[in-house]
């Protein structure tokens, strides 16, 4: 089985999550009798309500063609400059990017921010002009705008020689000419496999993985997601965490190893270089830490987590209306909720004042 790791970049409401839904359906990720919500990758309530991507997330599809199965890990990136640290960490896991633009609106300012990060990392883009069936579509002008965008971001010659697809995510088809109005997403699968390079990593070396996402499970505790840069990881294997300076954070065992299958994390017995996996078993390790075999002493290069840009103080409500509305009115409840959120959200830091 071959492997591809790719990220999708798009502005708000340009159809990224709808297109990924169709990739799921046409690759057989969803069973015929499985009830699936629209915009399945929008996982929290605010994302579903606003149609935006706040938290990066991983998923995968398997595409079979000519007797060969290709496992494609897809990373859905935040589309906002506010989440810059997360954007850069996520892009370090992939080997190519899909730039999805609206056929009428073209590339937007927030698209420029994330695309610039991808090009600076040397990733090769695929341009998808989505919503090609819009009556006000202007695909030729939008393609020119994408080329001008890449030029302004100092793309190299190889990055400027990008493939172009025209698609309708809602109707589930893509083609290589702007007059396409039917079909399926086979051209997109073919382009991903042919244009995005397979991970060129070291399967024989010692196990190393850079933690890029942090989550928390009520039963398993802290879960760290990243791409294995070298070696092999087995369940119950001894591991340790190193900070960005190489200082030890903790030692432990990989009590659970998960791969991504569709929208779900699926337990696996082992994984190897190039795989994007989630690991349980560590209690202190966090994003930007290197998770590695016990004999490893040098951490992987990592960008430190950006500090929060907004500070808030929560104090006891001493107004005349205190306690009249709501059922969770104690400051202790707010404290517990913030601390619980900080366990799985590296953008939040909670500091208690003297006296609680």
Model-predicted segments: where are they?
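Structural and coupling elements of P-loop NTPases
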Residues: 1-356
């Amino acid at each position: 089985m071959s492997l591809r790791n790719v990220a999708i970049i798009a502005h708000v409401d340009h159809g990224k999550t709808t297109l990924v839904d169709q990739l799921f359906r046409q690759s057989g990720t969803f069973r015929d009798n499985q009830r699936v919500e629209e915009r399945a990758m929008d996982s929290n309530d605010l994302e579903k309500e606003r149609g935006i991507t706040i938290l990066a997330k991983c998923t995968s599809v398997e595409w079979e063609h000519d007797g060969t199965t290709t496992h494609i890990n897809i990373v859905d990136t935040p589309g906002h400059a506010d989440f810059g640290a997360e954007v850069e960490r996520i892009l370090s896991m992939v080997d190519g990017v899909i730039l999805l633009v609206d056929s009428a609106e073209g590339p937007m300012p927030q698209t420029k921010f994330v695309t610039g990060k991808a090009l600076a990392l040397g990733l090769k883009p695929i341009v998808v002009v989505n919503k090609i069936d819009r009556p006000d579509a202007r695909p030729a002008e939008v393609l020119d705008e994408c080329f001008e965008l890449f030029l302004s971001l100092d793309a190299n010659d190889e990055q400027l020689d990008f493939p172009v697809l025209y698609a309708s995510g809602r109707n589930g088809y893509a083609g290589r000419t702007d007059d396409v109005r039917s079909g399926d997403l086979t051209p997109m699968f073919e382009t991903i496999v042919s244009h995005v390079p397979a991970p060129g990593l070291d399967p024989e070396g010692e196990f190393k993985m850079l933690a890029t996402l942090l989550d928390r499970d009520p039963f398993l505790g802290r879960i760290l997601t990243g791409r294995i840069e070298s070696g092999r990881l087995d369940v119950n294997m001894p591991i340790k965490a190193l900070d960005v300076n190489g200082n030890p954070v903790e030692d432990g065992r990989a009590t659970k190893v998960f791969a991504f299958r569709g929208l779900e994390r699926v337990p696996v017995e082992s994984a190897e270089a190039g795989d994007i996996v989630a690991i349980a078993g560590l209690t202190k390790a966090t994003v930007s830490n290197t998770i590695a075999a016990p004999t490893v002493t040098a951490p992987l290069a990592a960008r430190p987590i950006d500090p929060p840009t907004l500070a808030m103080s929560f104090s006891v409500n001493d107004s005349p209306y205190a306690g009249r509305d709501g059922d969770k009115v104690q400051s202790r409840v707010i404290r517990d909720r913030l601390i619980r959120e900080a366990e799985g959200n590296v953008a939040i830091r909670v500091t208690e004042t003297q006296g609680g």
